[in-house]
Amino acid sequence: IPMGYCYPGKGSSGDLPPRRECADLWLDRLLANLPNIELTLLIGHYAQRHFLGKAASGGVGKTVAAHAQFAPNRIPLPHPSPRNVAWFMRNPWFEKELLPSLRRQVRAAMRMDFDRNP
């Protein structure tokens, strides 16, 4: 679920941040109608800041590195943008350690959903 459904426009270094009033208007109402969420992937700074608050104040890199403290229900991830290729190259542990764990957790969450809703 995105932080905003409206495109905020382009800024000097990429897309502008999602508009705060968009999430304030609809996000809690939408999540209230999804009571069986087993796993939340917090992709990028804005989602991490919204859901983790001060725990995400060190930036995306530090928040993702501390992913174990948010497990098993929330996993902070960097945005998979081409602009982040350098980050992925500087952090090989992400692909070697976090991604295999993430894949297992997603498979487990999907199995739980299929078990509940055959």
At which residue positions do the language-model features occur?
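Glycine/proline-rich loop-helix segments at beta-alpha junctions forming the active-site rim
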Residues: 2-118
